[in-house]
């Protein structure tokens, strides 16, 4: 009886922490220390961030919850606790050998812990520089990707994961220190992640990464406040034709009136730090960079940097 009570108390404490997954990581009043040109060196930036994440403990072990513990809970025990937005912890430092084919990663869960946006700032000398600034998360408990699956193969002597299915996108909004909000579609659609080194073994320290597709935040049927859309709605707002006189201002109005379904790209890097051979589980940290919402072509996308944890399970195909 005492053991059951202890487990229940641990789960309740986990639920309390789950409601504040990014609070201690995204203080809006201070700028991040990471300053880089992410377009020129995404892999170098991701490697540095991965090293920092690996050094620090992203989740306190006392509040971590395993997949087995999650499975033991029913719907009412999970409802309203935030646990559904959490990735499980993996216990163990084993290693798993990947077959050449016939295997897949299932139940892949990707949970961001920090959200930063690339911003142009001016220092005391008046010099302009770009650096990632911390933001405040405005989205509640619906920003974690879960249930993702895909093929796991060995291609050209390196392990490769190809994403195929699952809840692989989540509409998310963050707020900059000045109050400006940045919506973006957190995703790993069509991800092809390759190992950084050769071999067929996944063990602590294993790294892989690759590019993915970032669809438009809005679909073609979306209408803006003036009733304009990509596939339906008005062609332009009332009284705007008179402003479009063939001189300055036409380009801005054209982008506002002509909605497009922008498809961008992103880059993600994973590093494994826990492996459970018996359950086939792997866990670790990730760093991802991608573009933000373009308001269907009327705005330039901002660069968003996300860092957090992931969980996955290696299984044979049925």
From Swiss-Prot:
InterPro entries: OMP/PagP_b-brl, PsbO
Induction: Expression shows a diurnal pattern of oscillation across the 24-hour light-dark, with increased levels during the light period (at protein level). Down-regulated in the late stationary growth phase as compared to the early stationary and exponential growth phases.
Keyword Signal attached: yes
Cell location: Plastid, Chloroplast thylakoid membrane
Transmembrane segments: 45-65
Keywords assigned: Chloroplast, Membrane, Photosynthesis, Photosystem II, Plastid, Signal, Thylakoid, Transmembrane, Transmembrane helix
Membrane topology: Single-pass membrane protein
Transmembrane helix found in the keyword field: yes
Signal peptide: 1-18
SUPFAM superfamilies per UniProt: OMPA-like
Entry's Gene Ontology BP terms: photosystem II assembly; photosystem II stabilization
Main localization of the protein described in the UniProt heading: plastid
GO CC terms: chloroplast thylakoid membrane; photosystem II
Similarity annotation: Belongs to the PsbO family.
Function: Stabilizes the manganese cluster which is the primary site of water splitting.
Protein known as: Oxygen-evolving enhancer protein 1, chloroplastic
Organism: Chattonella marina var. antiqua (Red tide flagellate)
